A protein has these predicted regions:
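RNA-interacting cores
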Residues: 1-260
Length: 260
């Protein structure tokens, strides 16, 4: 099963003012592309309780006076299910010469980057490669690139506690990885050894979502937990972590310190 992150480069098709967030508009556009490629798969994704998509917000420089014709932007789309790759690319290709609208702002598709090495944000792997990693780290740093939060009981928790982060990743891994590669439930014993975080409000159509951005270093003294956490940290680059990862939240990068 392949994991894929691809980047769609967009050009502004007119002068306009972009809303603070386009999370829902980007999600809707990706779903439309999927539907153009395979309506049945798009319906299954829409009805899924655990989204196989992780989406960035609109990446690019926003002028204070509004965007200008031709300004460059990008969207990163990560897929946790290899069955989505072909229909998504087919849907995007069918829109290649047409304007698309995000929050009433028109854009044209300039490029589609899907091969590693063609763009810094493009990545590819598979579940077998990740689970068979020979580089296990006891110290794992996760960088939270967009506001991140978690459900904790009936509340929303913005601080990325070890059990919330790695249970979120474990649940998503077990939902999409082949059965033979899935993990049992883990009673995490990891600790936060350092962090630099701030809260940030991501404006959504239904109101602001409060989440955390910054970095956290986690330490796992148990070798088996360190192994699983390393696998899940590498997976997080594709899956995101926490709530609303298909709406631009929980975008993650990871750094592992490998002991010699």
């Amino acid at each position: 099963m392949t994991l894929q992150s691809l980047v769609i480069q967009l050009g502004a098709a007119s002068e306009s003012t972009i809303p603070t967030t386009l999370s829902r508009a980007i999600h809707a556009q990706v779903m439309q592309w999927l539907s153009l490629g395979d309506a049945q798969i798009a319906t299954a994704v829409h009805d899924s309780q655990e989204s196989p998509l992780s989406l960035s917000g609109l990446i690019g420089y926003r002028r204070k006076q509004g965007i200008q014709l031709g300004d460059d932007f990008a969207v990163r789309i990560s897929l946790l299910d290899s069955n989505l790759i072909q229909p998504l690319l087919q849907g995007i290709e069918s829109s290649h010469n047409k304007s698309i609208y995000l929050g009433k702002c028109p854009f044209v598709i300039r490029s589609i980057y899907s091969l590693p090495g063609t763009h810094a944000l493009v990545n590819s792997s598979d579940y077998t490669i990740l689970v068979n990693t020979s580089q296990v780290s006891n110290d794992i740093t996760l960088q939270f690139l967009s506001p991140t939060s978690f459900k904790q009981n009936q509340n929303i928790q913005p601080f990325p506690l070890p059990d919330l982060v790695f249970n979120s990743l474990l649940r998503r891994w077990n939902r999409f990885a082949p059965a033979e590669l899935q993990f049992p439930q883990v009673e995490w014993q990891g600790l936060v050894s350092a962090f630099e975080l701030k809260t940030h409000a991501l404006k959504m159509e239904a109101g602001a979502e409060i989440g955390t951005v910054g970095w956290v270093k986690y330490r796992f003294s148990d070798p088996e937990q360190a192994r699983i956490a390393t696998i899940l940290a590498n997976f997080a680059v594709f899956s995101g972590v926490g709530r609303k990862t298909a709406m631009g939240m929980g975008q993650v990068n990871s750094k592992l310190r490998i002991k010699n």
